[in-house]
């Protein structure tokens, strides 16, 4: 959900740092498709692991068929997967189901298409190939670690064009 009156993420990070806390996820996460105004969502955490066998990412399609209103999807652990775990099709599905945005601790693809959709996507980088069956969704709504920061289910996430 976009919100007027919410300070920029950089200001929130500065206040957290002054308090001796962490909580910001950039870098290495950066906007692939940045939110033009501060956007808030409650974390829906998803753990992705690299493994040649298992259910693959099939469970994410079931997840994306439900109501995601106000949720910020946080995909943790995907950096080990040798390919993109997020792209245009998942972006379209998440937006249609009401999600606020997605943070991928891994690779994404289809930047031009995702930009046209206008859905906030943050990742560590881009990759042209998909996961080729080597990405497994192993947990949903558990505490995850992204860039040494713990993110629990329902934590408040704020993103903007800067991060």
Model-flagged regions — what are they?
Residues 16, 94, 155-157:
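Buried hydrophobic positions in well-ordered alpha/beta secondary-structure cores of metabolic enzymes
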Residues 40-42, 68-71, 97-100, 116-119, ...:
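Short coil/turn connectors at secondary-structure junctions
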Residues 63-105:
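Extracellular/luminal Protease-associated
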Residues 91-129, 133:
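Ligand/cofactor pocket segment of small-molecule handling proteins
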């Amino acid at each position: 959900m976009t919100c007027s009156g919410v300070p920029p993420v950089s200001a929130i990070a500065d206040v957290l740092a002054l308090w001796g806390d962490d909580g910001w996820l950039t870098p290495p996460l950066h906007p692939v498709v940045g939110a033009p105004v501060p956007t808030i969502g409650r974390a829906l955490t998803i753990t992705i692991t690299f493994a040649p066998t298992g259910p693959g990412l099939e469970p994410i399609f079931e997840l994306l068929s439900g109501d995601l209103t106000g949720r910020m999807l946080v995909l943790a652990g995907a950096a080990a997967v040798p390919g993109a775990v997020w792209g245009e099709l998942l972006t379209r599905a998440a937006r249609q189901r009401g999600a606020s945005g997605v943070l991928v601790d891994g690779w994404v693809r289809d930047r031009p298409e995702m930009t046209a959709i206008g859905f906030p996507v943050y990742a560590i980088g881009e990759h042209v190939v998909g996961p080729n069956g080597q990405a497994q969704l192993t947990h949903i709504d558990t505490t995850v670690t992204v860039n040494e920061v713990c993110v629990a289910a329902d934590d408040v996430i704020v993103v903007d064009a800067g991060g």
